[in-house]
């Protein structure tokens, strides 16, 4: 026990030394600014309102103190101990200017300026009688700022009146009153008033008032009502310019599809233009079909100007993936009989054809390391309608650099060819979406040869035809009415064939598989809305295969009536899975991320289990990180050679349940940390006598594998390098009552570390 006290005393001494060392480097007469505190006094607000207001006001105070971690200031310490670098490179320069941060001095704190900022914010929130005071407290060479705010009563909105007359503009402004953000009974808030001006501006611009702006609106505040209330009057400023009061229509539409940035936007000459489908097009080489513009530009001559259509048109042209830059402008046509704007679109195309090579490095939690070389050729305008054709060839290898397995090397060689057409191609129907995102019809054809050296070769053919479209920035759909997979094994070695008798899972790997069906995927995410405190990601998939041939041939594996198509037993099943993620910000640089995965496959007719390539797996760097990839389940089943001396694990199932949660926080500079817990398993839908304990049952919760650990993430801006160290605390294959193994955790034991610690190295976050 005494030695632990010594360690504790040593840690305390080191912490104190680090804290004191930061102030000894300060210039003479200076003190270190360690932050500010603000107290909300008075009884006009309840406790929760005071807390929220305090957080808001504290965020306004400047400067920010040096960052603190576990009571220390590591960045300031790094800055100090680096001294003065002699050159603009090297370790000391990196430590001082990349990792470290200079001391925030008390002399740089402007109490009066911060007091006025707080006072102003309170008044903007309707606390018109607020009082704010500020002072400092010193402790040796450290200074803390203290602010005291007495908000007083918050003024509420009594009434909202839209002032109007007979003019077209003011009638249009008044017509927006039904959707006003200013509500009687709500607190006065300057930000809401600014939002109301922007709302009116957006609505007015959609009615042709191109030159109108939010600055042309005035909201007068009458605080003489009494009883801490105000009356608001919304009106158009009397000095609003004449052009801002006029509603404009669209005149001629000019398109320059081969525009160079070296040209000037003043080039509005009608020479060399051809009038087609309502557009004046300057395209002597006929690079693009006119239908590209008619599907992408939402204006037509004679339409009332609409800013929404302006934004949609630019976004649609950009989303084609054919143009590098898209710019547009509007010019008043003074010779027109009515107020008219001519529209100009300047399109700078990307190179029509491109060739791209990539070299990738991979490392997996099953000790496989490898590399991939790929070469892609792309044509961004294959048939003149902005169709994108991509032909990709690739080759890769994976070798085992550690572990107990023999490590049979894996080689892949394949090609994947896709044609993406920027519209829906539906037989007997023709329609177009009216949002900023381009709908696409996609065709894919691929072939791959996978060779597990000394074991077997798999020949895979893939083909699909379908659609991809977005409803909006949050929702995306992908539908493939036709999806084909054909896998044929060859060159199966005698060694592998002999091993199948001892490991039934190995037989699934080399089964001939033929899958023909349809797939649908729906994705919802609000992660692009970074200002939200919580974010959600949802993805659901449905996969249906073998129904039509199954109905025609009447296949039923239970009675032995299995059917063959093109020389292979085709798969028949329904499969669905969902991936739901929730992100909760717990601080400025910390969050809790959680995920749940539910997967269910129902094999029937011609199949007793899902085909191997469609089954669910758990374990690995993006799953349950305390277990090797594909090594968990199904259920409590465990292969007798549990250490997988001969071959790497490849356990799978028809049903999947997985939970993950991790606490993410910023440590310093580019280094982030995480603490995590993972749980899950897979099961078979039907009973398999060769895999006892693998079938799903009511005791599934008692069969979950659980692991925990911690990790570091190195955020290099262009990629995130992730390292996770995990270990199991629950092993489902053990007997009931002995599955929890948390009491066996012993980091000091070499054998425990060898059998349980799993190191994961990966790119990007696991979810």
Name these PLM-found stretches.
Residues 2-8, 18-319, 325-328, 340, ...:
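Interaction-mediating elements
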Residues 5-7, 522, 537, 564, ...:
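In a subset of proteins, long, contiguous C-terminal domains/tails are tracked
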Residues 127, 209, 227, 352, ...:
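Strand-connecting loop/turn motifs
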Residues 138-140, 153, 544, 587, ...:
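A generic beta-sheet turn/junction motif
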Residues 169-172, 286-287, 306-539, 625-626, ...:
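Gram-negative/organellar outer-membrane beta-barrel architecture
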Residues 275-282, 362-366, 478-665, 675-699, ...:
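C-terminal outer-membrane beta-barrel translocator/porin domains of Gram-negative envelope proteins
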Residues 326-327, 355-357, 367-368, 384-388, ...:
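Extended hydrophobic-aromatic, low-complexity segments
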Residues 357, 389-393, 443-445, 538-542, ...:
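Membrane-embedded beta-strand positions of outer-membrane beta-barrel proteins
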């Amino acid at each position: 026990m005494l030695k632990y006290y010594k360690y504790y005393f040593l840690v305390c001494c080191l912490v104190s030394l680090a804290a004191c060392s930061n102030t000894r480097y300060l210039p003479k007469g200076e003190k270190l600014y360690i932050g500010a505190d603000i107290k909300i006094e008075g009884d006009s607000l309840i406790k929760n309102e005071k807390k929220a207001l305090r957080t808001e006001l504290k965020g306004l105070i400047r400067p920010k103190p040096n960052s603190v971690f576990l009571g220390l200031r590591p960045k300031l310490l790094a800055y100090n101990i680096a001294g003065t670098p002699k050159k603009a490179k090297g370790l000391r320069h990196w430590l001082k200017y990349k990792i470290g941060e200079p001391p925030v001095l008390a002399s740089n704190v402007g109490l009066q300026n911060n007091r006025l900022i707080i006072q102003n914010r309170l008044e903007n929130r309707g606390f018109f009688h607020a009082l704010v005071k500020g002072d400092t407290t010193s402790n040796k060479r450290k200074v803390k700022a203290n602010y005291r705010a007495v908000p007083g009563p918050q003024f509420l909105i009594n009434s909202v009146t839209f002032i109007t007359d007979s003019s077209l503009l003011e009638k249009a402004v008044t017509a927006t009153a039904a959707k006003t953000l200013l509500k009687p009974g709500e607190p006065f808030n300057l930000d809401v008033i600014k939002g109301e001006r922007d709302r009116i501006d957006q609505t007015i611009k959609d009615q042709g008032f191109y030159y109108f702006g939010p600055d042309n609106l005035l909201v007068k505040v009458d605080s003489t009502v009494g009883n801490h209330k105000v009356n608001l009057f919304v009106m158009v400023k009397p000095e609003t310019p004449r052009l801002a009061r006029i509603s404009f229509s669209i005149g001629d539409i000019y398109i320059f599809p081969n525009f160079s940035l070296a040209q000037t936007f003043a080039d509005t000459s009608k020479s060399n233009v051809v009038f087609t489908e309502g557009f004046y097009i300057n395209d002597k080489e006929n690079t693009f079909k006119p239908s590209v513009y008619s599907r992408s530009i939402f204006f037509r001559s004679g339409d009332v100007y609409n800013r929404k259509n302006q934004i949609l048109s630019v976004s649609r042209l950009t989303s084609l993936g054919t143009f590098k830059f898209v710019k547009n402008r509007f010019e008043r046509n003074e010779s027109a009989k009515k107020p008219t704007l001519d529209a100009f679109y300047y399109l700078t195309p990307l190179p029509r054809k491109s060739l791209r090579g990539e070299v990738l490095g991979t490392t997996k939690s099953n000790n496989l390391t490898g590399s991939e070389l790929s070469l892609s050729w792309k044509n961004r305008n294959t048939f003149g309608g902005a169709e994108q054709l991509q032909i990709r060839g690739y080759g890769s290898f994976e070798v085992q650099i550690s572990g107990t397995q023999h490590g049979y090397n894996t080689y892949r060689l394949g090609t994947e060819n896709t044609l993406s057409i920027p519209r829906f191609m539906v037989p007997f129907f023709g329609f177009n979406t009216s949002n900023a995102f381009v709908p696409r019809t996609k065709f894919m054809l691929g072939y791959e040869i996978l060779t597990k050296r000394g074991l077997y070769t798999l020949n895979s053919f893939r083909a699909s035809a379908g659609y991809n479209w977005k409803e909006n920035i949050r929702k995306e759909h992908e539908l493939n009415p036709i999806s084909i997979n054909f896998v044929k094994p060859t060159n199966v070695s005698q060694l592998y064939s002999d091993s199948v008798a001892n490991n039934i899972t190995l037989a699934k790997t080399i089964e001939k598989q033929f899958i023909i069906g349809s797939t649908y995927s729906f994705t919802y995410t609000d992660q692009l809305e970074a200002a939200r405190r919580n974010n959600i990601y949802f993805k659901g998939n449905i996969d249906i295969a073998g129904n039509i041939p199954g109905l025609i041939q009447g296949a039923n594996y239970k009675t032995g009536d299995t059917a063959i198509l093109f020389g292979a037993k085709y798969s028949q099943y329904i499969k669905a899975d969902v991936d739901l993620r929730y992100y909760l910000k717990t601080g400025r640089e910390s969050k809790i991320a959680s995920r749940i995965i539910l997967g269910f496959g129902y094999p029937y007719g011609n199949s007793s289990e899902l085909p191997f390539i469609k089954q669910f797996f758990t374990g690995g760097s993006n799953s349950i990180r305390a277990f090797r990839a594909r090594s968990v389940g199904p259920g409590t089943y465990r292969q007798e050679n549990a250490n997988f001396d001969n071959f790497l694990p490849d356990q799978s199932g028809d049903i999947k349940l997985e939970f993950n949660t991790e606490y993410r926080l910023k440590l310093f500079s580019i280094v982030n940390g995480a603490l995590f817990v993972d749980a899950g398993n897979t099961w078979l839908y039907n009973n398999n006598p060769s895999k006892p304990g693998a079938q799903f049952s009511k005791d599934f919760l008692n069969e979950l594998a659980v692991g925990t650990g911690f990790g570091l993430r190195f955020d290099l801006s262009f990629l995130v390098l992730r390292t996770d160290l995990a270990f199991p605390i629950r092993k489902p294959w053990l007997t009931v009552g002995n599955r929890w193994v948390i009491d066996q955790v012993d980091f000091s034991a070499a054998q425990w570390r060898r059998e349980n610690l799993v190191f994961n190295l990966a790119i990007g976050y696991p979810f």
